[in-house]
Structures are given as C-alpha cells and as structure tokens.
Amino acid sequence: MNRRRAYEDDGDFYGERSRKRRRVSENQEMEERLETLILRVGENSSSSLESNLEGLVSVLESDLGNFRSKILRILSECPIKMPEKCTIYSTMVGLMNAKNYNFGGEFVDHMVKTFKESLKQCRWDAARYALRFLSDLVNCHVISTNSLLQLLDNMVDAANEDSVPQVRRDWYVFAVLSTLPWVGRELYEKKESALENLLVRIEVFLNKRTKKHHNSLRVWSVDAPHPQEEYLDCLWAQIRKLRQDNWAEKHIPRPYLAFDSVLCEALQHNLPLIHPPPHQDSFEYPMPWVVYRMFDYTDCPAGPILPGAHSIERFLIEEHLHSIIEAHHWERKDCAANLLNLSYKDKIPLEYCIVEVIFAELFKMPTPRYLDICYGSILIELCKLQPSKMPQVLAQATEILFMRIDSMNTSCFDRFANWFSYHLSNFQFRWSWDDWDSCLLLEPEHPRPKFIEEVLLKCLRLSYHDRFKEMMPETYSKLIPKPPMPTYKYTMEGAASLPGTATAHKLVVAIRQKCTPEDVLNELKDLPNPRETSENDMVESTFNPLKIDVFVQTLLNLGSKSFSHTFAAISKFHLVFKTLAETEEAQICILHNVFELWVNHQQMMVVIIDKLLKTQIVECSAVATWVFSKEMVGEFTKMYLWEILHLTIKKMNQHVTKLSKELSDAKERLDRNAESSSSESEEETAPAGTDAVTPQRRRKKPIGDNADKPTEEQVERMEEKLEAAYVDQKRLFLIIFQRFIMILSEHLVKCDTDGRDYDTDWYRWTVGRLQQVFMMHHEQVKKYSSTLESLLFTSDIDPHILDVFHQFTALRS
C-alpha cells in the first residue's frame, strides 16, 4: 500500500470538510447579518429611513434565493415582537411585493398562518399585533381591502357567538377596534359603507354587553375628577372621535406614504377565508380592565398639550409606552431610557404620560403585570436620567394620589404605600410632610393618616427607628411606630406573679447552655394546664397553653437579635414546636404568643409566621382562623395582617401547584417508559433477518430512565396527595370567606339596629380586604366558585356582600 497516496487522499478529505465548514460558517454569518439589518431598521442612522428601506429591500431581494425561509420568518416575527415598528415592516413588505409578487403571496400566507397559530395557542397580544400588521399591509397595497373587511367581519361574528364567555367576545371586538387607527382611513376612502356596517355591528354589541365587573376593577370608587372608563367603552369613544375627524390621526408614522407611486402599481393579494378557532374550556382570555387616568391638560405646565381622554392619540401613546415596559421591564436602565426616547416626545408632555402609564401598571386590577418593585425601580431611574423634570412630575402625582386616597381601592392603597416607602428610602426619606399635617385632625382609621402610618411602618423595614425621630415633624409623633423591640412578659414588672415565670427563667439558662429539644420538653412537663379547671374533668385537654406560652416567648426572645438567630432557634427546637402544636387550637396559641411578643415589630411577625408555615409547624387554616380571631380585632385594618394572610394563601397555592406539576411529570414519564418498553419488546421479538437490538444499542439508553421510572402505585399515591391538597385549599378559602361574611353581616345588622350609617371607614377597609382576596388569588378561587356560591354566597346574605362575589365571577364570565 502506498502511504503517500493514503495521506494525499486524507488531505483531499479534510480539505473538502474544511470547505464545507467554511461554507456553513459563511451562511450563518450572512443569516445573522440579514437578521441584524432587519431588526435594526428604523433605528438611529445618519441616512433617512426611506433610503435605509430601499437599500435593505434590495439586499433582501438579492438574497431571497438562498435565505427565503429565513427572511419570511424574521419579517413575520418582527412586527409582533416590535409592534411600535409595524409600519416600517409593512412598508418593507410592500416594496418587496412590488418587486416580487410571488414573495408577497408567500409572505401573506406565512403571516396568516402566524395569526391563526397565535389564536389557537391563546397568545392574544401576538394575535392582535398580527392582525394589525395584516391591516397595515392594506395601506401598502399588499392585501385587498375586501379580504381584510371579510376577516374583520368574521371576528365580529365570533363576538356575537352564543354560549361563550364574554371575555372571549370582548377580546375579538377589542382586536378589531384597536386595528382601525392603522387602516381606518384607507377603508373609509375605499369602502366607507362596509366600514360603517362594521361599526354599527360593534355598537350593537357594546350596547348589549354587561359590565358587572367594572366596579371591582376601579382604582377609585368615584369618577371625579376623571371618569374611570371600562376599556372597551373608552376605546369605542376614541374610535368615534377618530371617525368624526375623518379617520385622520397624527401619531402613527407612515413611511409607506413616501413610496406611494411605487406601491400603488403593485398587485394585491386576497386573504384566505379565516374563521377564528371555536371556544374551548381550556382557553384563557385576557381579563377586562379599567383605563387609568391621573392627569388632564390642566395639570401640565405650558408646552405641548396632553391629548384628551377620548383622542385616539392618547390610546396610541399609552399602548406604545406599555409595550416598551413589557419589552424592557427586566432591565430598569434600558426601560427608563427607552421610555424617555419615545417617538414624538417633543409633541406631548412625555413625563406626564410616562408617570400616568407606570401608575396605571402598578394599580392594574386584579394584579399588576410585574412586581411592585419593578415599577419603583424604573421611576427611580427616570428621576436620575431626567432630574430637572421627572421628580417634580412624580411629586405632583403623589400629591394627587394622596388627595384622592379617601376613595382609593384597598389593593391600590397597599401598592401606593409600598411604592412610596420604597421611593422615599432611595431619596433619604425626604418629603414635605408639613403639607400633609391636616390629616392629623382626622380619625385614625381614615385613609390619609392610615396611609402615613403604614408608609412609616414600611420605611422602618428599610431604615432604623431613630431615623424617624429626626426625620418626622413633632406633630406626627402619634403616627411614628414604636421601637421594634420584643415585649417579653417574663422579665417585665409584675412577672413574678405569672404562673410560668420560674420555668421561663430555667428555660433561658438551659437554652443558653445548648440543651437538646428533649431537655426543653422535660423542663416544660411539670407546668400546670390552665384548661383543666377541675379535678373532675373527664376529658383530657388536647394542649397546654401555658407550655406553649413559656416556650414560644422565651425561645423567640432569645433569638430576637436577628432574623438568622430566630430561624436557627426555630430549626433547632422544631421537635418541641411539633410536639406542642399537634392540633389547630395549639397552633393558634403559638401564633397568639408570636403576636404578644412582637406586637411592636410587624416585619418580625411576618417573617416568623412565614417560617412556621414553611417548617409545617402551623397549618394554613390555623393562620386564617387566627387572623379573624377576636384578639386581632385591633389589628384588623393594618396592612401587615393581610400581608400574613396573603402569604399563607400563596403557600397553599404553591403547594398545590408543586404537587400538580410532580403528578403531571410522573404521568408523562410513566407513559414515555411504557412506550419505550413496548418498542423494545417489539425489537427483541423481531423476526429473523431484521435488525435486532444489540448489546451496544441497549447500552446507549440513558442510565437514569429506569431509575426515574415511577410505578403506577406511586402515581396513585401522588394523585391522592394532590386531591388532599385541593381539599385543604378549598377549606382554607371557605374559612376565609365565611369569616368575612360573619363579621360584615354582624356589622351591617348592628348598624341597622342602632340606626347608624353602615358605610364607616372600618366597613370600607373590610370590604376592600374581601375584594383583595378575590382579586389577588382569582386563578385559584375561580376553581371553587360553584362551591362558594352554594355554601356561602347564597341569595339570603346581604346584597352589599353578595355584590362583591358577583363582581368577581363576572371577571371571566
């Protein structure tokens, strides 16, 4: 054998492979370059947008032969992921269609497929942006007006279906209405009568629909000075105003107008007949919302005028700002910079628009899209980027919110207090407190003094107590929180007369000497049980409150130095907690002692109860019962108590979600392994002459497959655990709502008997908390709506209470 020849052959082989790699690499580079060019079009450039578009279209046309599918995919994704550049991409597609009719047809088919897939997969925003883009292609002479009108008519038909949720019907009308600012003028000029018929059908629909959900979504309970309109009503008013103006708007950039002479010569495509997919029970539709208004033109200084509430420009500006927040909410600096760099920023009072939109997001009911701190951090970045204007606008907004706080929704009150305390902590807690001192003359339960008190309590979590003495005017002394110190009764004056004092002191010594949990139980065993009042009691008491009192208060007082010390103490003596807290009554007793010790430190209470839930020392139902107990009456309107209740509900919800996911994964693995075993047995029993499974092929099977394979018995046990968790979750909600009904009914009956007005501050706080539970946990509560309706929210309870439940059920009806 000629070795030289062999090496030469090898050289040819490796050379060929190298050329292939180089060719693949070049293709990848070209694809990435094309993608970058398409994504970046319309961004800062030294040349005009029109010349950029012409150049890019020429590049894309020359590369269609090699990268057709890639170009189709990118061009169909961009207007959905970057809806603010919709008209730029429609112009680009229009120019390509004018040069290459076949490509235009392929693109329309691709876009229609994207639209239909978005509807099937319940990606409602993507579907709406796809519909908008298809509509804008009419302006670029890519799609015919007749076929678009047919699509819009089909969507209105979907809105008039019977026996489907109203939220589905609402979305289809919203999608059509929100598209009209882009294509309304074109339809008006070419198909005026068809457009009018479409609008008449929409008006009939809007006049018939119910709005029971409206009140539960309002930020304020009154409409002065700004009405709080339901989103479809507001958009309809804006579209009617646009129609009065002959569909002429001043906000949407329309680069295709510069190419009208080219585009008008292009052949158009007809959309295929598109029918929205039928409703399925698994479909989740967007919930309704109320359009938030904080400012009007009188609030803004001299300069650009804020568009009116019913001008389409207001809708377009707000939608653009919302989409920027959605795109950049993970990075606050980028988000703030992009908000301040909005197109047409010189034609509007931008700072006022931004602040209004951010508070609209923060106060969105039933829950904001993102964490409260997300909006707070964006506002701080905005103040840093624009220190000459933004802090003043934000201060003005805060003043407006405080003045209107009397009628503010309870959930929004909490978010406002959380945001304001966080904001103050980033600006050295400076504020013109003297401007608000008139609130000191009001009742303590009134929202204004209550707001300041809650803000200071939240600030205390972010600072230290002495800071408040220096920071706050003396007139506010009654609202300043007490020092956050434990109240340990066994060292206070008069402690000698308490029955557990001697044992408490022994326990302190024992714990400091690093005793075991068994030693602690031994110290506690001789304490008398105050529940056994007589020697003749035949039934032994299920728990000893004195043991719990002495142990819990002593241990937590010793761990009071920090959260870490407290957690370490709870972990070390977990056995003692579990031994003493065998019943729900005993667990409530533990919670009572946590409250008694830490009554002046709300954050410590929240953190300890969270730890007790995580370590399963107390059950969620015990916390719910304790929150509504008589000893907590004085705390009932304080925010921290509801923080505890909501974290308890979330713990239960997370537990159910975790078990549900584990069961789903186990079933999937079981099915997968069953299929794998079946195919293996088929291969092993293959007839002679066919490929059998060799030992080498068997070895390629992942090692973990059999190890992770669950048995049917394990899956059954997991199903039982999940079923038990659902029962616990339902019981938790039943306890909470039953207690709400009891205390509210008692208040209403008492006021009626005494001839007093029931609408007190306490009543409004309590109804607000009931609404808050429904709203914050709407996804979980809706599963038990029928149970709640049949057992608790029956027709015989007071209409004021029943109305809250009906508003909740209307959210997804």
From Swiss-Prot:
Feature: compositional bias, Basic and acidic residues: 702-716
UniProt KW keywords: mRNA capping, mRNA processing, mRNA splicing, Nucleus, RNA-mediated gene silencing
GO CC annotation terms, alphabetical: nuclear cap binding complex; nucleus
Record region (Disordered): 667-716
Pfam families the UniProt entry points to: MIF4G (PF02854), MIF4G_like (PF09088), MIF4G_like_2 (PF09090)
Coiled coil: none
InterPro entries: ARM-type_fold, CBP80, MIF4G-like_typ-1, MIF4G-like_typ-2, MIF4G-like_typ-3
GO terms of molecular function: mRNA binding; RNA cap binding
Any single GO BP term: nuclear-transcribed mRNA catabolic process, nonsense-mediated decay
Gene3D superfamilies the record matches: 1.25.40.180
Cell location: Nucleus
The MIF4G domain, residue ranges: 31-243
Family affiliation: Belongs to the NCBP1 family.
Function, in words: Component of the cap-binding complex (CBC), which binds cotranscriptionally to the 5'-cap of pre-mRNAs and is involved in various processes such as pre-mRNA splicing and RNA-mediated gene silencing (RNAi). The CBC complex is involved in miRNA-mediated RNA interference and is required for primary microRNAs (miRNAs) processing. Also involved in innate immunity via the short interfering RNAs (siRNAs) processing machinery by restricting the viral RNA production.
Record note on quaternary structure: Component of the nuclear cap-binding complex (CBC), a heterodimer composed of Cbp80 and Cbp20 that interacts with m7GpppG-capped RNA.
Name of the protein in question: Nuclear cap-binding protein subunit 1
Gene name for this UniProt entry: Cbp80
